[in-house]
């Protein structure tokens, strides 16, 4: 968290859904904090993402949203908290009726949101985006709303760039040292983190498909004269058994695979990802954490318009992204139609451009 300029505008930003959605709001939050005079930025988030909000360098205050199903008493307490802070503006990155009604009742003078659905009636500044067309990345839609807010407040904008979690990205050497003390990893080989879980919402490859992919990457790396990577398998809550099963399969097929050691909570897990040379997953929250760390991300996406690789693109640098999805004409969510052999070859080619820690300086920065 950070501190704002005295007498600066007080903003309330709302993105109160899943981890991945919240991580894709960090570029917008960075855009707001880069403006001058620098505003005070509070966020309204669910308890699940509060730890990450507290770790975000672009946030001054975190307010917990009790959610749609909370009691009337809890909703009234939230309204009181919002009122007593005397916010100058409300920026809702994803508009809902409850949040629009909350901002209106709290008496926030400037209320800005996407012009979508009937919840927009509670906002006096509406930005037409047509997100359902998925013509841009989600994080760019969020940044456009932040840029509009900066303009409405008469602030001076500034350019921002990855990494959007610079402090955690700078902790890469420490995270690598910690992991090397826990697992028998060589710095002569790349450390590829693989997250096979779905978080309950994202479409992802099956465990068998990931095993096939890893075998292909290992084989292609050896064919081009590079050592195969170490594979560190991560897991979210309730996904541990699947992760263990994948590790067993990979070890049995001859890959160098390990389960990531337990981490202290969501923030600890998120920070630990900085140790990776590459992060592979479906379009899940951890993939977007890796994007904020400006890691090399390798994502597997469905082909439906609301969930394309473009729409849910990670917010790292353009040259640090690879994405795969079902071919045209296949089922939108049929991940079995992705050509894993072609994907493995592309991944191996990109990994061959990354320097191992033993080849680079002590920062371990991936190329």
Residue ranges of predicted features:
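Catalytic machinery of carbohydrate-active enzymes
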Residues: 1-367
């Amino acid at each position: 968290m950070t501190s704002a300029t005295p007498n600066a505008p007080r903003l309330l930003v709302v993105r109160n859904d899943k981890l991945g959605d919240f991580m894709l709001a960090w570029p917008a939050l960075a855009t707001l904090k880069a403006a001058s005079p620098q505003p005070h930025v509070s966020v309204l988030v669910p308890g699940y993402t509060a730890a990450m909000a507290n770790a975000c360098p672009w946030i001054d205050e975190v307010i917990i949203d009790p959610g749609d199903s909370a009691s009337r008493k809890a909703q009234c307490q939230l309204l009181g908290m919002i009122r007593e802070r005397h916010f100058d503006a409300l920026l809702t990155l994803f508009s809902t009726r409850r949040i629009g009604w909350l901002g209106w009742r709290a008496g926030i003078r400037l209320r800005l949101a996407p012009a979508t659905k009937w919840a927009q009636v509670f906002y006096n500044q509406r930005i037409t985006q047509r997100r359902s067309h998925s013509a841009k990345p989600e994080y760019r839609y969020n940044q456009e709303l932040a840029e509009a807010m900066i303009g409405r407040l008469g602030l001076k904008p500034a350019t921002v760039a990855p990494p959007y979690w610079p402090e955690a990205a700078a902790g890469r050497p420490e995270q690598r040292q910690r992991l090397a003390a826990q697992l028998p990893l060589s710095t002569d080989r790349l450390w590829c983190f693989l997250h096979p879980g779905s978080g309950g919402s994202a479409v992802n490859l099956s465990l068998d498909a990931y095993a096939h992919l890893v075998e292909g990457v290992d084989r292609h790396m050896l064919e081009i004269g590079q050592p195969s990577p170490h594979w560190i398998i991560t897991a979210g809550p309730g996904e541990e058994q699947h992760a263990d099963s994948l590790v067993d399969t990979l070890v049995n097929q001859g890959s160098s695979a390990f389960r990531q050691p337990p981490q202290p909570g969501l923030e600890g897990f998120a920070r630990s990802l900085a140790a990776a040379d590459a992060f592979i997953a479906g379009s899940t929250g951890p993939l977007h954490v890796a994007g904020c760390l400006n890691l090399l991300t390798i994502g597997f996406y469905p082909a439906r318009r609301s969930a394309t690789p473009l729409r849910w693109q990670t917010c790292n640098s353009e040259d640090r992204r690879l994405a795969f999805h079902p071919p045209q004409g296949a089922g939108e969510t049929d991940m079995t139609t992705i050509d894993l052999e072609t994907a493995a070859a592309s991944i191996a080619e990109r990994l061959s451009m990354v320097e191992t820690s033993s080849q680079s300086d002590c920062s371990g920065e991936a190329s």
